């Protein structure tokens, strides 16, 4: 009886010992197992300010069999694939957050490695579209805001926009918030569909607060996608910034928008 209990206890003990494949480095039960990890080799460092609208990152995993995916500003941009670098273009002004994650063939995943960085590619006073780029499908509507960037004592703005009606339609053009802080303002749109263009004239009519400074939205446009392709929405012709006494303000840069329709 004692022998039976002895062998039974040995049997129960051995059943509790975790089993693993000695030759499998991906088995988490293996004492030699190393969890997946990723290291970013190149790209902006934490909180760096970059002065271009594009950025490149490269990374490496702790095992050559790994696949990777990456994120920008909380959005998955590329799912699991055999990639180790990326060039991100058409970045908007301001703060961004890049992240990359690795995975073993067994689907064990690493922690996501993040880098925060800032884009300051546009020197004001300038006109620019936000966002710079929309990815869309046929029939979808997307919204662009037209910003006055880093202006001082701006009282009026006039700009002309060109686009391709074969690829997109302009569904609406409305006033932004920048001049709405004044008691009175005007917002006039001259749209010529035959010329694939429209012109906006907007101004403050308030004698108490005749101008604004900083960065803000002059206009908002809603665009509907007609067909596949890349559509450039550009500033053209005479574009003007004016101060309180109708003084001309130089526009240093004019940056349009892009719609890529699939």
Say what each PLM segment does.
Residues 16-125:
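Low-complexity, disordered linker/stalk regions enriched in Pro/Thr/Ser/Gly
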Residues 16-18, 120-262:
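Acidic, low-complexity intrinsically disordered segments
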Residues 11-14:
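C-terminal motif of bacterial Sec signal peptides marking the signal peptidase cleavage site
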Residues 2-7:
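Sec-dependent signal peptide recognition
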């Amino acid at each position: 009886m004692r022998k039976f209990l002895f062998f039974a206890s040995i049997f129960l003990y051995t059943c509790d010992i975790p089993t693993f494949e000695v030759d499998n480095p991906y088995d988490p039960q293996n004492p030699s197992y190393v969890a997946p990890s990723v290291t970013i080799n190149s790209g902006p460092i934490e909180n760096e300010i970059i002065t271009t609208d594009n950025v490149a990152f490269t990374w490496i995993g702790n095992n050559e069999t790994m696949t990777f995916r990456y994120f920008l500003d909380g959005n998955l941009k590329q799912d699991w694939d055999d990639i180790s670098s990326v060039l991100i273009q058409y970045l908007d002004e301001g703060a961004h957050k890049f992240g990359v994650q690795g995975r073993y063939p067994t689907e064990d995943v690493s922690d996501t490695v993040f880098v925060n960085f800032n884009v300051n590619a546009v020197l004001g006073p300038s006109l620019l579209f936000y966002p710079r780029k929309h990815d869309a499908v046929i029939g979808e509507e997307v919204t662009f805001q037209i910003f006055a960037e880093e202006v001082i004592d701006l009282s009026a703005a006039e700009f002309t926009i060109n686009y391709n009606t074969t690829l997109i339609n302009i569904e609406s053009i409305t006033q932004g918030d920048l001049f709405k802080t004044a008691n009175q303002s005007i917002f006039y749109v001259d749209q010529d569909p035959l010329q694939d263009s429209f012109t906006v004239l907007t101004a403050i009519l308030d004698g108490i607060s005749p101008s604004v400074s900083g960065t803000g939205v002059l206009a908002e446009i809603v665009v509907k996608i007609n067909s596949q392709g890349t559509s450039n929405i550009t500033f053209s012709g005479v574009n003007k910034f004016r101060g309180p006494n109708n003084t001309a303000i130089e526009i240093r840069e004019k940056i349009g928008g892009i719609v890529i329709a699939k």
